């Protein structure tokens, strides 16, 4: 069973976060590696700039954006398998910087991983 959570980079770190993986294409402004408390940065698993720019948080494009992002993930099995490997060993927290806590690529990535590789408790972020 996979335990994958999501959390904004601005939320406090917690020992219960497990492995903290930054899943943003750009490093968050104003953060050092120590301040962010990340264990890994997987920018290759994030949506490409072209897709991000096309979507630009236009919710009317959300469904197509998600389909295109999932297709990109299907074509990147190495990065996906790396996350799965770690999630099989313990909790993984996907870190993202966007302000939108409901519609973001980290929640899409979590949904993709769980739909392909296993279900977990529906809680999205750490308490």
Roles of regions detected by a PLM:
Residues 1-127:
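Residues lining hydrophobic/aromatic ligand-binding pockets adjacent to catalytic sites
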């Amino acid at each position: 069973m996979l335990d994958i959570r999501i959390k904004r980079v601005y939320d406090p770190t917690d020992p219960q976060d497990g492995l903290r993986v930054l899943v943003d294409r750009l490093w968050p402004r104003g953060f050092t590696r120590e301040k962010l408390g990340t264990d890994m940065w997987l920018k290759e698993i994030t949506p490409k700039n072209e897709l991000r720019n096309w979507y630009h948080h236009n919710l009317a494009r959300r469904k197509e954006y998600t389909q295109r992002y999932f297709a990109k993930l299907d074509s990147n099995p190495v990065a996906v398998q790396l996350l799965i490997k770690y999630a099989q060993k313990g909790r993984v927290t996907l870190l993202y910087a966007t302000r939108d806590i409901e519609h973001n690529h980290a929640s899409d990535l979590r949904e993709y991983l769980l739909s392909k590789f296993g279900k977990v408790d529906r809680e999205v972020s750490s308490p």
